[in-house]
Amino acid sequence: MESGRRPIVPYTGPVPDVKKLLTENRFARLADLVVPLEVLGETDFVRHIHAQFENLSRDEMDELVLARTVAINSAPSLFSILLMAEETCSYFSAIDRLDIPVNPYDPYASTLSALKHATFSKLNVAKLSCMMSNGERPPSASSDYDFLKKIASGNGATVKSFSRSSESTVAPFPAATKQVPDISDIREFDFETFRHPFQKVICFLATIEKVISEIKGHRAPGCIAGGPINPKDRSRYIRDYDKQGIMRRYKDGCIIGLVKQGFCEHACNDNACRRRCKFALSVPYNLGMVFCPPTENSSVEDMDAYFERNRCPTRNGSFDDSRSATSGDGSSCSSAHKVTTPTDGVMMPEFPFSDQTDTSNNGTVRFSERRVSSSSKHRRRSNKHISPLDRPNDYHYQKNQPTPSDEKRYYHGSGSSSTEAVSTASAPLTGSAANQHPQHCGGQSGSDTGVISRGEGRHHGSHNGIPDFVSRSPVTTPPEVFSPERRSSEERSSSDQRRKSPLSRSASATSGGSKRRSFVDSPPRHESEDEDEDSDSSSSEAQKDRFKKRSGSRSNTPPSSPSKPDSAPAASASPGGDGGNDSDDGATEKGVTSNAKESVRVSERFETGDKSPTFIETEDESDDEDDQMSITSYDHSESSSAESGSETDGEDGESDMTL
C-alpha cells in the first residue's frame, strides 16, 4: 500500500444486492442507499460490490448493463445524472485505492460513455457559453466552452463543428477568442489545465473512459477500436493507465460540489441565461405535454399507472413496497429522511415528481393529486388509487341493476345490437332511489338512461356495447367546449309541460304536442300477429294515404316543414297514432293502440335491418320554426333513443317519448 493513504479496514455492514436494485420494478429511496464517506474511504465496501459482478453470468451481466443504460438515458434531471456520475467515480476511485483489477464489462464500466454524454447534455441545458465566458465578448466565443465540448466529444479528435475552418461556408459556432488545443488523449493534460469546474467534472468521466477503453484491448486511446492486444501485455489495474494520477485527485462527493461551484460563481444580466439555469437545476413536474392524442392500445393507461403508482409515495409520506411486484420485505423507509440539493437551504422533493410550487391549492400538492381532485365534486369512486385517465366501466353498473320488467326491446344498429329493459313507468328517481344508484345520479345523470348530466362529464358513445364515460378532472377542459348544445333556445322557451308518464307522453305525441317520435320508440314486434299483411307496395300506399290525412287534419297550422324525399312517407309513419287520433285535446291510451297492425308494419320494416335515415317528426303549435320534419342520421351507438331523448328529462318537463 502506498504511503499517504489511510489503512483499509474490512467492511462488516449490510451489502446491497446489485441485481435486485438494478432490475426491480420500483424507485428506491436515495436515503436508504446513502453510504457514509468513512465507509467508502476507509473500508473495502466497494470490494463486495465488485465481487457480485464477478459472479454473474454473461446474460445476467448484459441485463444489468442494459438496465443501467436505460436509467441513464431516461434520467429526469441534472441532479439524477450527477448522482450517477458521483457513484461511478467513487466506484473506480475505490477500485484504484483497493488495487482491485477492473472488470471492463460490469455495468459501471460499460455505461461510461453514455454517462459522460448525458452529463454534458444536462449541463448544456444551461447557457454554458455565457457561464464559461470569463469576460470574453461575445460570450458565444468562449474558449473554455469549446474546450469542454472537445473533452466530451468522445474520441478526442477535433470535431469540425467545434471550430471554424477556411473551407466551410457555415460555422455552427463562432470561432473562439483563444486557440483551443486538440485532444488526442485527455491523460496528456495536467489536471490544472482544466480551470472551470464543469471541465473537471467531464475530465473525471473522460479519464475513466480512456482507461477502460485500453483495458478492453483498444490500441488507440478513445473510442476508436483497434486490434486486440496480447493479453500478456494488458493489465487490468487503473494505476498502469492513469499516469497523471487524475483519479487520485478525485474525492468522494466532489462532483456535486464542482457543479454547485460552477453555477454559484456565475453572475450576469442575461435573462436567457438565468432562465436556462433555472430549468437546468429544476426537476420536471410533468410530462411536458399539452394534449394527448388518442391511441388504439392501452398506452395512455399504462403510462399514467406508471407515473402514479411507481413514482408516488403513499399518502402518509412513507415508501410503499407493495407498489412493486418484486420488492421484498424490510426495504421500506420512513419519510423522515430528506435529500438535499447542492443549493443551500433548498430541499429536494421526496420523489422526483412532487409539486411544491402549485399555487392552485393551499399547500404542497403531490403529483398524483394534481389531476384528480379530492373535493366532493370530483370524488373518486373508491378508496383505491384510480388513475384520472382510466375510464370507469359504466356498463357494469347498468348491467347489475334490477330490471323493473321482463319485457325487453331490441335495437338494431350498424352491425351491432343491444338490449335494454323497458319499464312501464319511467318516473324520476326519488331521494332514496338516487342514493341507491349513485352511479346514475351523482356523477352522471338523474335517469337510468346513462346520459351525462351537465358539468360532470360527457358521453362519447359506446364501444363494444360498453358506453365510454370520461369523468371531468380539475385540469381538463370544461364540457362546454367539446360537447354540443343539448337544446336550442326555441325548445327552452316552449318547454312548459310537466313530467308525464310514458303512456301519457306517447298519447300526447299523437295529438300534436311538442314531442318527437322516431322508429326506435315503436312498440316491440309481436310474432303472433299476422305477418302476411305487410307487403312493399300496399304498405307504401297506406303510408302515403295516412300522411295525407294527417296533413289535412292540421290545415289550420301554417305548414313550414321542408319537402320530404320519396322515402319520407314510409319513415314518417308513427307507430302510436293515426290521422283520426290527432286531436289537440288530451289523448288517451286508446290512441296508442288503435292502429296496432300499422305499427307492426313499421316495426317490421325497422327490424329488417334497413339503414335508411330515421325521420323524426317535430310538431309544435306555438312555434312555426319547430313544426318541421327534421332528418337525422342513424344512431349507430348502442344507447338508442333512450340516451338522446331523455337527456333533458326532468328539466321543465321536456323529454322525448320513451317506452
Curated annotation (Swiss-Prot):
Stretches with biased composition (Polar residues): 354-365, 503-513
Keyword Signal attached: no
Feature: compositional bias, Acidic residues: 617-628, 646-659
Protein name: mRNA export factor ICP27 homolog
GO BP annotations, alphabetical order: regulation of DNA-templated transcription
Low complexity composition-biased segments: 324-336, 413-427, 553-575
Chain segments carrying region Disordered: 317-659
Record organism: Elephantid herpesvirus 1 (isolate Asian elephant/Berlin/Kiba/1998) (EIHV-1)
Protein role: Immediate early (EI) protein that plays many roles during productive infection including regulation of viral gene expression and nuclear export of intronless viral RNAs.
Family that this chain belongs to: Belongs to the HHV-1 ICP27 protein family.
